[in-house]
């Protein structure tokens, strides 16, 4: 590549020093795209298609510069001209193509597939406004469209286009590609995003409301449109079918271009179904193969040998079940195929629990994936065992050979090199760079001789990252935080099973404790980040409580110097890259058995935070790796929780009556909080906790408070705390997504 200075002069007709940050960003965007364009596509005979409703890719400039090996040179050229790459990157808008862990995992995975030199593309939709932009106003979440698409972007319009048939009309798609360069190798893959030229943002009314019936104009406007009514559910089906029909046609076209006769399609393609949203790819592939003259039996056999399903949840609400009549209304041409798939299952298995179409005429997408795919994987060891022994036991009894575990991972290029360059460079200095390609080499930190020097440096790095976060929050939200406080952080989408409400009850405990004269050894800053689905009322209520507590504490001069609560507005990948390196206490407090894996826990661990968590998801594997003395575990285990559910034995009212719990829950509807908040919202959350509490907040609350208090006390022994930090960073290598993807390939995909 030519120098950046020459490129800027050629394209902007001025030097780097003379450019604004906006001009430099456009120049750098195109410079980076040009460098990526020079990489060859991976061209193995067999290709994985990772189909997902979400790809939470984050800003791409620095990430792509790192993978292309250009980051240090570009940073220096900018610096020599008096410019700062971080300030230039501020101009970039974060792509709004995902929401939570599902989408971030997909982004890490396509990065790792490329970096391992495997042939594989992500396939999804190009949402114009993503989920939504979160605005915190009047102590509540408000939603507005998240406009991220600009004329100059990472998207490259492809010449490919497909006809997608629906019941009453056909839509013509447009395909956009985003290059995914591998880390310091000569090849790349792509993220393929389908869209519609007819989509029209003018139909959006107030907030994120829009006409859900005008499919040609609304189809790719938003990720996860509100499905609390019939029209919203139908729109989800339109979206999902548009994604998989385009994906299936792309798969067949590319296989034919490589020489497939379609009878051998499984030699050319393997489809990884990421959660149940892309499940209709199975009947759609069967439809396309039979249309091309392949018999039904053979078409089913081909598709069964090329589709694999990743289960991401044991929450029944998230395992999609669509009314057959809705499918008949949207995609009637798929219904006979789905009915035939169900008929074959019924002919072989009498257990109603494994049928695809249930007695209420609902189509169970996960059931179709399991019967008509060759692999079913969970995403953490505990999660996979729960699937086999409980949630999907009826299927495991039929197909034990299909079930396997692939513990999730994260890309260290995004979450260490990019998010925490100070720590990354220090690890390079003392360990060398082997860990860039083999993350297990981080274990060498354990045997590094000068432990005192390492601890002193880790203290300095953490302090530096806290100041960086403080500046970020001041600039983006006008909030000032104390960089000398303990940073206690819970960042993830708002859901009752993730139990942000339990953390809020701890905040109440601490507030009342300080009011009673028990001053903590040092100030504590409790940081929350996450969005609540617009139709998820209780999740909105939890955000409201957190914001009310923030106001009550800030306005209390006896407490404010010692405790602060901050809800980070519009939490996204960019915010995470500031929050994670600055964190001391990583909150991973889901009800045991409910979190499939989690990946935030891995990012925090890698960046030197200690985990406060239940024995749930990947916390179990973190605990096994670091040892009980280097993690803070509380709460009931998954077996106990599952048993309580089966026997309907948990009564929140009994726990509410306890002396240690009642004052905390009552404080939600105290005069102080009601003065800051909405009575209806606060009373609804209060009643939910004492009368229902489906995710057993009060069951674990006392132990949570006890262990968290122990953690705060342990923090004051800096030497012992830093010993734990070193162990956590050293053992994080297992959670590299490169390791996860290598296992997917070895056990499932079998790519060259």
Q: Where on the chain are the PLM-derived regions?
A:
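A conserved ligand/cofactor-binding region detector
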Residues: 1-752
